[in-house]
Every structure is written in structure tokens, then in C-alpha cells.
């Protein structure tokens, strides 16, 4: 049997780079769940005092082409382009992903729609920032 080398996984490896392809982000999420977890950061206005705004993304889903808006292509990767009942729709490098569940720092895991009811992100004006 031939051995291969794999680097040690660090917590920082889970940072979501929204300019990557949707399929790559979804695979990253599956690979790094439950540890180290895939994460992004909320816009500054949603951060609580003494909180980094780190949000662990625990579930994403692909949208059918019929459910997408061609105008979303003009937005930068990481931009929340729409808010659906199931959660925020975030622009990626080659399309969009629906964030179906996430866990804010110091909080329990929530469905994407429940998260939006507590922190109403505005489409096309708020971004999920990389670190």
C-alpha cells in the first residue's frame, strides 16, 4: 500500500471563501463538519459587543436555475442577494448558495429562516465577510 501525506487540519482551514465555486463551498462544508467547522463573519452592525461576528455555517443547499435571478450575477461574492423562508441566499464565485442552517458565536444552531428573523440581513447591502 502506498501512503500519502495530508497536512494537519487547522481551525482556520474552515474559513469560507465566497469567491470559490458553489460546489467547492458545499464540499468544504461536508468535509469540515463537525470539526473544524466552516465559518464566515457577519457585517459589523450585527456584531454584539465583544463578539467577533463569527458564524459557523452548518448547512447549505443549491437553488434550481428557475429560482435564481440573473441580476444576482452582478453582485460580489459574499453578498446576501436574497432572503428566503429557508435562509439567506449568498452569491458565490459561480452562482448562489442557500444557507439553510448556521450557528452564531455564543448562540445555538438555528435554521436559516430563524436566523434571519433574529438578524434581518438586507439583500444586496449586507455582506458575509471573509476574515
Task: Describe each PLM feature range.
Residues 13, 18-131:
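An anion-binding loop in the catalytic cleft
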Residues 1-16:
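Flexible, acidic loop-helix segments that line cofactor/substrate-binding pockets
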Amino acid at each position: 500500500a502506498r501512503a500519502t501525506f495530508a497536512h494537519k487540519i487547522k481551525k482556520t482551514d474552515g474559513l469560507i471563501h465566497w469567491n470559490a465555486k458553489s460546489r467547492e463551498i458545499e464540499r468544504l462544508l461536508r468535509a469540515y463538519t463537525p470539526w473544524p467547522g466552516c465559518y464566515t463573519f457577519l457585517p459589523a452592525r450585527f456584531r454584539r459587543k465583544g463578539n467577533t461576528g463569527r458564524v459557523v455555517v452548518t448547512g447549505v443547499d443549491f437553488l434550481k436555475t428557475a429560482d435564481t435571478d440573473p441580476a444576482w450575477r452582478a453582485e460580489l461574492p459574499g453578498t446576501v442577494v436574497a432572503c428566503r423562508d429557508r435562509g439567506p441566499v449568498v452569491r458565490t464565485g459561480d452562482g448562489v448558495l442557500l444557507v439553510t442552517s448556521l450557528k452564531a458565536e455564543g448562540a445555538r444552531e438555528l435554521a436559516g429562516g430563524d436566523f434571519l428573523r433574529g438578524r434581518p440581513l438586507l439583500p444586496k447591502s449586507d455582506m458575509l465577510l471573509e476574515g
